[in-house]
Amino acid sequence: MAFLHNGNHTAVTEFILLGLTDDPVFRVILFTIILCIYLVTVSGNLSTILLIRVSSQLHHPMYFFLSHLASVDIGYSSSVTPNMLANFLVEKNTISYLGCTIQLSLAAFCGTVECFLLATMAYDRFMAICSPLLYSTKMSTQVCIQLIVGSYIGGFLNASSFTLFFLSFLFCGPNRINHFYCDFAPLVALSCSDVSVSEVVTSFFSGSVTMITMLVIAISYTYILITILKMRSTEGRHKAFSTCTSHLTAVTLFYGTITFIYVMPKSSFSTDQNKVVSVFYMVVIPMLNPLIYSLRNNEIKDALKRHLGKKIFS
């Protein structure tokens, strides 16, 4: 049963997710592709976390933040992918009210924390390249923990705003969500209660998080670029660039897709395009991050070679 009647209001017990496609053949193809992506995402990010834990040469702030980014990427992908995979195998894609609440909360939490972590990692690179003599003091263990805790608190507060407003919504049915997961925008469109305040507040919080973190990243890399251009040593320039390119690649991919969905006018792209971009930043990017950081970072590659060599020759 999808509805429970209580007086003049209708209490929803489940939603119908319209998903990515109705074509049964395409559903099987998508199931196979996304399952492979999810397995690579979990194994790749877990490998990154374990490698950083066991490699003493990676016990630095940059890799401490990277291990948390890998954890968040697993959570981000897991917030939508398992349910999406299950729905590919059934005709009627449903999700319970509680499941929708959890999915919305976890996706908002992980997405917000990822923004803060990417900004924190940019600040870390700024301190390492622009103020190397003060780096060990400015990026002490205590400071790193405070930055991580602050990122998670920020994620919790932003996710709470989405969750609380969603719980206050009234739905008159039919509760068909034109998406593959419980995103806030289609839920707002379904609600038959006044959503004006919720739209303004959640847009303000999300916009503030996005703009502040992008500003921190932009300022950090502006100073980094100026410092690198002033370096006389070619080797020093190359090393500085190599430590920043992987992070810049991850930042460009993540914020590029967020800008497409949340900044561009809604009339400029269709709902189907929105779904495709959502798949990219919630499913594909969490898989790409460990590949980007491992392939473009010599310290991670060296640590991986050392541990693989120990396993092979032990």
UniProtKB/Swiss-Prot annotation:
Membrane topology type: Multi-pass membrane protein
GO BP: any one term: G protein-coupled receptor signaling pathway
Stretches assigned to the Cytoplasmic side: 50-57, 124-136, 221-240, 296-314
TM spans (from-to): 29-49, 58-78, 103-123, 137-157, 200-220, 241-261, 275-295
Top-level taxonomic group: Eukaryota
Topological region Extracellular: 1-28, 79-102, 158-199, 262-274
Disulfide bond residue pairs: 100-192
Molecular function terms from GO: G protein-coupled receptor activity; olfactory receptor activity
Pfam families (UniProt xref): 7tm_4 (PF13853)
Gene3D superfamilies on file: Rhodopsin 7-helix transmembrane proteins (1.20.1070.10)
Location of this chain's protein in the cell: Cell membrane
Coarse class of the protein's main subcellular location: membrane
Glycosylation sites: 8
Keywords: Cell membrane, Disulfide bond, G-protein coupled receptor, Glycoprotein, Membrane, Olfaction, Receptor, Sensory transduction, Transducer, Transmembrane, Transmembrane helix
GO cellular component: membrane; plasma membrane
SUPFAM superfamilies linked: Family A G protein-coupled receptor-like
Family note: Belongs to the G-protein coupled receptor 1 family.
PANTHER family assigned to the protein according to its UniProt record, in alphabetical order: OLFACTORY RECEPTOR
Record's function text: Potential odorant receptor.
Protein name per UniProt: Olfactory receptor 5P68
Lineage, highest ranks first: Eukaryota, Metazoa, Chordata, Craniata, Vertebrata
Name of the gene: Or5p68
